[in-house]
Amino acid sequence: VPSSFRTTITDAQLRG
């Protein structure tokens, strides 16, 4: 899994 993809998911969760 590309780190960029995981970063996008994490960012979305943090933003809520």
Curated annotation (Swiss-Prot):
Q: How does activity depend on temperature?
A: Optimum temperature for activity is 30 degrees Celsius. Stable below 40 degrees Celsius. Above 45 degrees Celsius the activity is sharply reduced.
Report the cofactors.
Answer: Ca(2+); Mg(2+); Mn(2+)
Q: Which GO terms describe its molecular function?
A: metal ion binding; metallopeptidase activity
What does the free-text pH dependence field read? Optimum pH is 7.0. Active at pH 4.0 to pH 9.0. Stable from pH 5.5 to pH 7.0.
Per the record, the domain of life is Eukaryota
- Protein EC: 3.4.-.-
Q: What class of enzyme is it?
A: hydrolase
Query: GO:BP terms for this protein?
Result: proteolysis
Membrane-spanning parts: none
Keywords associated with the record: Hydrolase, Metal-binding, Metalloprotease, Protease
Role: Metalloprotease which hydrolyzes the alpha and gamma chains of fibrinogen. No activity against fibrinogen beta chains. Active against the synthetic tissue plasminogen activator substrate H-D-Ile-Pro-Arg-PNA and the synthetic plasmin substrate H-D-Val-Leu-Lys-pNA.
Additional observations:
On the 2D-gel the determined MW is: 51 kDa.
Task: Provide the protein name.
Answer: Herinase
Which species does the entry assign this protein to? Answer: Hericium erinaceus
